[in-house]
Amino acid sequence: MANTEAWTVHLRGCLFSFHKELIVLLMQLNQWITRAMGLLLLTSLVTSVYGQNTGSLTGRIVEEGNGAPVIGVTVTLQKHNRILVTDEVGRFSTANLGSGAETLLISGAGYAGKEIKIEIPIGGVLDLGDLPIQPTQLQDYQAYVGVVNDLEINESGDTQAVSTSVIVSNDVYLKNSGYQFSQFRHRTRGYDSRYEQRYINGISFNEQVRGVFNYSSIGALNDLTRNGNRINYLGASDFSFGDIGGSENINMRPSTYRRGGKVTLSGANRNYYLRGMASYNSGLLDNGWAFTSLLGGRYAYEGVVEGTFYKNISYALGAEKQWDNGTHSVSFITFGSPVERAQQGSSVQQAVDLVGCSTYNPNWGWQNGKKRNARVVKSWDPTAILSYVFAPNKETTWTTGLGVHYNRYGRSGLNWYNGADPRPDYYRYLPNYFEGQPFMQKYYTYLWQTGQISQIDWDRLYNTNHINNISGDGSAIYMVEERRSDLFESALNSTYTTRLNDHVKLSAGMGYKYSLSRQFKTVDDLLGANYLLDVDKFAERDFPGDQTTIQNDLNRPGRRVYEGDVFGYDYRYYLHSLDAWVQQEHNYHYIDLYYGSRIALNTLQRNGLMRNGRYPDSSFGKGDVHTFVTFDAKAGITYKINGRHLITANASVQSRPPLAYHLYVSPDITDNVVPSIKSSKNANIDLNYIFSTPKVNGRIGLFYTTFWDDMDKAAYYNDVQRTFVFHTLYDLEKVHRGIEVGINWAPTSALNFDFIGTAAQYYYNNNPMGVMNSTNGNVVNQEERALMKDLYIGGVPQVLGTIGINYFINYWFLSLNVNGFGMNHIDPAPIRRLASNYSQVLSQEAIDRLPEGPGRADAQKKHDAYKLMTTQERFASGCTMDLSIGKIIYLPGRQQINFNASVQNLLNKRDIRTGGYEQGRINLLYPENFGNKHFYMQGINFFINASYLF
């Protein structure tokens, strides 16, 4: 690392190191923001009228029939060439307008366009009241949030594999791709979910440990998460600096909800079969109070994937008080969505072929006549938010909020000690393992096809432990553990927005977040054993007779643990972040532009509660505090050819601290970190043509994003070292580039067509360094370059498209989509790209020079295995078809019944691979034993939703 001057500061016993130049910059920026915000607030309090000879305009866009506010609709003033967007209550407003005739162009994705002729007065305010627009689609994308995301969380639960917006975007491409492409595990521009920011009532809810928003925290709360703002990509925002994947602010303030109640009942054949919600909102009462409440849940005794189940209940309560004509508002809301669900596992192709089912799930087996799943997730994320909004005039808003939540997250899994592998698809139990033994191959094929060994044999596990209780020492050979990743997090955010003059708007904000993450595992079920010995099974094998190295906790050697006890590992993460950002927007007749910057201070520390025998000096107690100062900048410009045609360009440079999981090489057992500690960086640029005519509207965009100094981590069993290893890549470079097209053509008021697609490349752009560390202590900081350059980012299609036909008549809605996809690749394992694993492999030219015989055959087999194991698998392209139908029935007294049903994969294609990963085990003589593991698209599936509003 460079020898730059640093400051050392002692704060309550903790040691922090800061780069001097960056700290000075942070202090100067904070002082400037504080002074500017104070001055601007004072100015806004005493000046709220900008001119005597100009007029102002305000109005509210509502849905025809029920009067519900429509968020994110574009309102264009054609003569003034000014573009407005409706806020979370459907309202738009602007000032300093020249008097005379004007034409309003109203457009929103999923709504019929509308033109309104108005006359702007000289001075005063023209209030247009409620302006109804007609929906052209009833496909309730927001209702699908829980359906999409719960299936797409990977096996470890560390990352969410798709991008799904809670707030529907007004952008034609984003509105359709978020749901329509979710079945293919689409991610916005291929970005990880941590590049999308989620806020609730102005509070940041991207957790600091994983960097993502926890969608399960709002499961079955769909009716309370519809309102809010969405910023497409890294555009101008008044609640956040934003991120390259976009940002959302879910508005849960009770006063923003439609007065009345709603009862919703949904059915599906996916991860759950039944969902119900009942909510009631008081609206804003005459005394300034507003209240909201919701109770919901989701359930499946067995989901569409065999051996899975789903149990969930959700709740929300909120209250708000406004006074002084809405100048002041204080709101409080609390919600939660505890869930217990069984997971599906991936498997190799041979196992899938043997059972004849693409959704084969190796995670379950029979026990006492009932199906039992070994991998069960239990999660609960109770949340409370207190928010204060001060709006002294129409041009100024100051929002401050405090959010607190605690996430209890655990996932169970089988563990074993001195016993045969209990997983049914373990490579030794597959016919391929018995190469050259035709009888054994036929025998194991028969066992698989008759279902005798295709699932977990729970009875055998219990019997093995029972025998050891009688004739052995009574310790568990097989058991179920629960791996816990609990999180307590508190966040404080304050944002300020004001209009400085006719053309300039200023937004600024500050935020602080504290996170305490508890990482440990407990004994969930001893499966009939008396106890479990808390030692490392790999270390005991590799260090026989060494009673020190094998201990998981030297402070309590030879410890026996029982159900509910913590064992194996136990440590904490302490994370602090402080950030400040400022942004300015300029609006002129032909040009709009914005620019902004953000600076952040982040600290991370690990505290080990066990002294591990493999790392006795670096596992126990508090480790070093790692400090990162990051800086972001963004800018964008819009050229308004006229009110219907725009050209936009956006650019940004960002940096962010590494995730805790990436920074520590083996966090379960040591405080050691990667050799090169850097903040990851990215630079982004995009160019868009946006158009909105009476018949056609949409966007065509180009984007290019490059990442460098990034990190990634994989964990797998290493056959060479015969132990479990963590493999961390650092100094990683990636490129995401492509084109996006979203076009809606409405030849008539009843018929419109969607043309949505993206063609992109997401790939690794260098050969990063990697460092491996084993859990048994045999491998310590083993470094080698991984040959990843030009491999594709796995698990996300790089070419996607859909053509949709939407028909609307008398509040009946019918949609048909034909989807195409391609260029989807397996997630590559870095260990397969280490040259040291293939030191015995000869080139084809060298093999051709060898004499015929066993030696040449063996060399050819190794060479073929090398090519197989280093070639990235590309999944087959394909197409699917989706159908949806809906109906709105309006009743007297603003009552309403909604019905919508959708069917995905109407052609029932079950052979479509949507994702998967390469195994980390390498065997050059028998590579077929360690084939890739895949996920497949479910066959035909449906979602039915009915709701009654009163």
Annotate each PLM feature.
Residues F753, G820-K861, K887-F950:
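C-terminal beta-signal and adjacent terminal beta-strands/loops
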Residues N361-T383, S387, G623-D632, S655-W708, ...:
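Outer-membrane beta-barrel signature, preferentially recognizing the C-terminal barrel domain
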Residues E340, S346-S347, I550, N555-R560, ...:
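Surface-exposed extracellular loop regions of Gram-negative outer-membrane beta-barrel proteins
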Residues M479, K505-N642, M769:
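Signature of Gram-negative outer-membrane beta-barrel scaffolds
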Residues Y704-T706, H727-R832, S947-L949:
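Gram-negative outer-membrane beta-barrel transporters
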Residues S165, V172-L174, I203-L234, N251-R253, ...:
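Short acidic/polar hinge/loop motifs at secondary-structure boundaries
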Residues E320, S329-S387, G410-E481, G545-Y562, ...:
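Acidic/polar loop-and-plug regions of large Gram-negative outer-membrane beta-barrel proteins
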Residues S56, G267-A300, V304-Q344, V376, ...:
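Transmembrane beta-barrel wall of Gram-negative outer-membrane proteins
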